[in-house]
């Protein structure tokens, strides 16, 4: 194995659950009681193309030297010294505790490279915990759900970025491993990589050379496989008039204008009531995993019968999963009055999918290869917006102007005070607003802020997350401390 990772953190944040997921089986005891793991376990692990050793440690405890907890802490310190890097796990649902801060300082003192892992990120309210995590001084939190397997692609990317490709691939760089990097059957994804500290002066430019993961979804027989075959220039996938020919998610490597792309053709996604065969149920589940693993999702609609109820359900699922959607109106070669039909389709897109204003939609013919370049141009632009980060200074200057022009309404005779705003993640863009009474803030005003963000910072066509919290500005006074 090329390198070793130690999983550390206070008790009951999900370290052993993450360990079990990385090793592929339940080797570590998992329970809700703190301190279940009393010693460290070392095992071979794999995360897509990364092969390494992982150490599961006892939860860090503050304790007297002669106690069991002290010996558990000694085991953890030994694991840190043996490891090449540390996965420091916090509970995003519970937020940051004094114990997290104490042991984050201990990990920093070790000098080992650290990935801050925000576990239980699928839980409601976890955005606030990720917001608090900045105060640990361990960098941008990588949100995951170890229990459900969400966020694993982002964790993989964070490890590679931390240690460098030469280090992580020093011993093994085989073709089979490369092919397994993006196997959708083992994947569930949330959000978050390529993110800088909110206090950073410079925002990193979009990397147009980075490989791109695209899932192609739609109702059965919408032309998904035909589109991929045209892109690849070969009959890689079985196509035909029968709905449901593609039974599973099939991946293919492609290049567009020199950029490497992994394409996923998913099984046609039917309504649940019509998914009867066990094999087809598995195929649809595989398609859902492919969506979660993708960065951009191309929704293929049959232009002759667009916006069926199931089309809207698929689009809503993609938006809720936080992926970057682009619509392809396929079979455009069958449309006669194209200008009138296209205007009607654009109007329906805006009206039927109001969750994401400015959703990009392109007419194509997968069979004839028409509109593919235009489609890909929109895919790349949407991906860039999905990865966008806005500096804290710009956000708060904008917020001041918004409040001056249109302050939040009074609730029960009391004004709501909006104090501060920061971006806590990208992929999709996620923001937290600090205010006096989050529970009292009308959802109409939250939507007003989201729409303002989208318009002011040019973010059409991607989901935007915005949550409210009561805590004070965590970055206030930081500049004074540096003096």
UniProtKB/Swiss-Prot annotation:
Coiled coil: none
Entry's Gene Ontology molecular function annotations: GTP binding
Residues that hold GTP 2 according to the record: 218-225, 265-269, 330-333
NCBIfam families documented for this protein: GTPase_EngA, small_GTP
Function in brief: GTPase that plays an essential role in the late steps of ribosome biogenesis.
Stored HAMAP family: GTPase_Der
Name recorded for this polypeptide: GTPase Der
Organism: Brucella canis (strain ATCC 23365 / NCTC 10854 / RM-666)
Gene assigned in the entry: der
């Amino acid at each position: 194995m090329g390198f070793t990772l130690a999983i550390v953190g206070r008790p009951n944040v999900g370290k052993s659950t993450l360990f079990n997921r990385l090793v592929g089986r339940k080797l570590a005891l998992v329970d809700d009681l703190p301190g279940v793991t009393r010693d460290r376990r070392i095992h071979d692990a794999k995360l897509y193309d990364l092969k390494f050793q992982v150490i599961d440690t006892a939860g860090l405890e503050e304790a007297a030297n002669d106690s069991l907890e002290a010996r558990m802490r000694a085991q953890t310190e030994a694991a840190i010294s043996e490891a090449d890097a540390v996965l420091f796990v916090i509970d995003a649902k519970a937020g940051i505790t004094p114990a997290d801060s104490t042991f984050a300082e201990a990990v920093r003192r070790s000098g080992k490279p650290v990935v801050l892992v925000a576990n239980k990120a699928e839980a409601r309210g976890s955005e606030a915990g990720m917001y608090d995590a900045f105060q640990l001084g361990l960098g941008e939190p990588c949100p995951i759900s170890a229990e459900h397997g969400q966020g694993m692609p982002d964790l993989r990317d964070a490890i590679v970025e931390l240690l460098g490709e030469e280090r992580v691939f020093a011993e093994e760089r085989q073709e089979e491993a490369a092919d397994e990097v993006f196997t959708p059957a083992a994947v569930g994804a949330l959000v978050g990589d390529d993110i800088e500290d909110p206090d950073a002066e410079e925002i990193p430019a979009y990397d147009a050379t980075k490989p791109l993961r695209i899932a192609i979804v739609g109702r059965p027989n919408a032309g998904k496989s035909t589109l991929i075959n045209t892109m690849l220039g070969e009959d890689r996938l079985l196509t035909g008039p029968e709905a449901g020919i593609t039974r599973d998610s099939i991946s293919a490597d492609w290049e567009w204008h020199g950029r490497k792309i992994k394409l996923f053709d998913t099984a046609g996604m039917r309504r649940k009531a019509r998914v009867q065969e066990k094999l087809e149920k598995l195929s649809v589940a595989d398609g859902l995993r492919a969506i979660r693993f993708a960065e951009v999702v191309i929704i293929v609609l049959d232009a002759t019968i667009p916006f069926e109820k199931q089309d809207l359900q698929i689009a809503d699922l993609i938006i809720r999963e936080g992926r970057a959607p682009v619509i392809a109106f396929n079979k455009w070669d069958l449309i006669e009055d194209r200008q009138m039909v296209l205007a009607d389709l654009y109007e329906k897109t805006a009206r039927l999918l109001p969750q994401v204003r400015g959703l990009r939609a392109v007419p194509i013919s997968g069979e004839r290869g028409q509109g593919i370049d235009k489609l890909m141009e929109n895919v790349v632009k949407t991906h860039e917006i999905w990865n966008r980060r806005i500096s804290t200074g710009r956000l708060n200057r904008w917020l001041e102007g918004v409040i001056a022009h249109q302050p939040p309404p009074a609730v029960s005779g009391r004004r709501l005070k909006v104090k501060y705003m920061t971006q806590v993640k990208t992929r999709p863009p996620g923001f937290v607003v600090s205010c006096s009474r989050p529970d009292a803030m009308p959802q109409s005003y939250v939507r007003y802020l989201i729409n303002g963000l989208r318009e002011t910072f040019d973010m059409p066509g991607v989901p935007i997350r915005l949550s409210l919290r009561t805590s004070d500005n965590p970055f206030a006074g930081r500049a004074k401390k540096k003096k």
